[in-house]
Curated annotation (Swiss-Prot):
Cofactor(s) essential for the protein: Zn(2+)
Source species: Shewanella woodyi (strain ATCC 51908 / MS32)
Function: Cleaves the N-terminal amino acid of tripeptides.
Main location: cytoplasm
Residues holding Zn(2+) 2: 139, 174, 378
Protein name: Peptidase T
Cofactor note: Binds 2 Zn(2+) ions per subunit.
N-terminal signal peptide: none
Catalytic activity: Release of the N-terminal residue from a tripeptide
Enzyme Commission number: 3.4.11.4
Family: Belongs to the peptidase M20B family.
Active site: 80, 173 (proton acceptor)
HAMAP family, sorted: Aminopeptidase_M20
Amino acid sequence: MRQALLTRFLRYIKIDTQSKASNTRSPSSDSQLEFAVILKQELEQLGFERVELSHLGYLTASVPKTVDGVPCIGFIAHLDTAPDFCGANITPQIIENYDGEDILLGDSDLLSTEQFPSLLNYVGQTLITTDGTTLLGGDDKAGIAEIITALAHLIEHPEIPHGEIRLCFTPDEEIGRGAGHFDVPGFGAQWAYTIDGGELGELEYENFNAATAVIRAKGNNCHPGTAYGVMVNAQTMAARFHAKMPLQDTPEGSKDYDGFFHLVNMQGQTEEAELTYLIRDFDIDIFEQRKRWLTERVNSYNADLVVGSLEIEITDSYFNMKEQIIPHPHVVDIAKEAITSQGITPLVKPIRGGTDGARLSYMALPCPNIFTGGHNFHGKHEYICVESMEKAAGVILAICSLTCEKYLNR
């Protein structure tokens, strides 16, 4: 499977499929649909059944069951890559038998073991890195390659017992819309796994509760030469508001189960300005407290103003999937056993973000997240270990087999 997996991955990352948050249609970029068409043709050639591509960019397919009495399960990955950094003209570097030293990325950057000590876990293995000018696209082209390679193996070996296996490749996960048009009843799986995690062994079934707060400052513009006592600069209002936000309650000041406020965008002019904050926390009660606290800060700020005002609008994005996974412990237990079967210790950790699986779990499709083998997603220091990708494909196969064993032996 190694060569097929590597060939697929290197072919997929050459296709720029960055999503575009400014575009409200689905998919948000034409390239995602073009990539889905390519994958559809590949799945048909490999012998997958019920291969369907919706006009909204959702590609689904099936591996038919070889035995009866086993639940239908699914595997999910996303077509888009992050818009955070350049995703076009990707030129990967393949480092075989990695020696544990710093890796030069092209001519101008470095993947250093001091900054990224996880590199030392892969001495003697094969790494794929960027050339320092783009992201790599392992999030989530690696997941797509691993799912197709693993399930193609099942098609090639019909003697392996398993129930029906479904796959779905979704658009626009990176901009929070991946589950927006997901047809859960049509998908037909009792549970599923996103193959969208990071380092070897990761298994995630907790994620942030997430909301976005948009704070709009309303000022008063006039000619600066006659501004005395008249002008109210909305940008100054916004800057002063942010200056009093807690300094350590940020992404760079938090870890593990800490939540945060993240100023992700600020823009404006004298008349109007806008601050956009991401609100994140694992604990639903603290999450709600954060939203109330930010609203109260805006109200308090307004109370001290003579002219001008702030307005706040908060929109929930997704919630912690743990609440929906706990009632279905077998979904996690099978994944843990599958990871262990590949000689890996499961690395159970919370997702300091979200996945399609978080929203799908609230749509009656329990959906934990499993590793792809990649590190440092969304930037030029992204890299992935080929051996870890092989292990991910092995975990997918093991999940299919273990599900079959557990239900046939009841």
